[in-house]
């Protein structure tokens, strides 16, 4: 798979357990049952979900749910992951967890594309950023380029913005 997509809105099956949420996707991969279980075990471990594997998704915190969603997005081992508003609706501790997961994906050689309005959270983990206004890219560059741009400050960030 070339790209996997994680929508802004929750995509977990709330009445299924954490493991079942992975399993339902794994069943469509063509892997043997043994390989499916092994892949689920790896994802549970990698995303700190092992202790929650029997918990229903309905009872997960925002950060736990987001980790499960990212784990599901990686089941087919994509080259890129598109994260739509990954920092929406999660607490500050979970933001740090998600930032760590994004860094880990990058370290694994998985490209991460993020669309998000939470500028501070996003700019601290990205290599390159694009500022769009009314559907048009008006500025691109490193996070420092964006933060220090008068244009970015006037059309989006505001004069008092800092990382």
Stretches with model-predicted labels:
Residues 16-35, 46, 159-160:
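ABC-type ATPase nucleotide-binding domains, specifically the catalytic core motifs of the NBD
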Residues 23, 34-52, 100-103, 151:
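Conserved ABC ATPase "signature" region
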Residues 56-60, 64:
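Conserved ABC ATPase signature
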Residues 70:
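Hydrophobic anchor residue at the start of the ABC signature
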Residues 77:
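Conserved catalytic motifs of ABC-family nucleotide-binding domains
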Residues 81-85:
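Catalytic Walker B motif of ABC-type/P-loop ATPase nucleotide-binding domains
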């Amino acid at each position: 798979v070339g790209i996997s997509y994680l929508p802004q809105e929750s995509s977990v099956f709330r009445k299924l357990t954490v493991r079942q949420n992975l399993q339902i996707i794994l069943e469509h991969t063509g892997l043997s049952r043994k390989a499916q279980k092994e892949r689920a075990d790896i994802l549970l471990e990698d995303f700190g979900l092992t202790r929650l594997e029997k918990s229903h998704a309905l009872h997960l915190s925002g950060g736990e749910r987001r980790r499960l969603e990212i784990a599901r997005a990686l089941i087919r081992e994509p080259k890129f992951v598109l994260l739509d508003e990954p920092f929406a609706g999660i607490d500050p501790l979970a933001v740090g967890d998600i930032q760590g997961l994004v860094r880990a994906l990058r370290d694994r050689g998985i490209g991460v594309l993020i669309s998000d309005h939470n500028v501070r959270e996003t700019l601290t983990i990205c290599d390159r950023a694009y500022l769009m206004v009314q559907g048009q890219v008006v500025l691109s560059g490193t996070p420092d380029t964006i933060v220090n741009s008068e244009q970015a400050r006037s059309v989006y960030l505001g004069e008092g913005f800092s990382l």
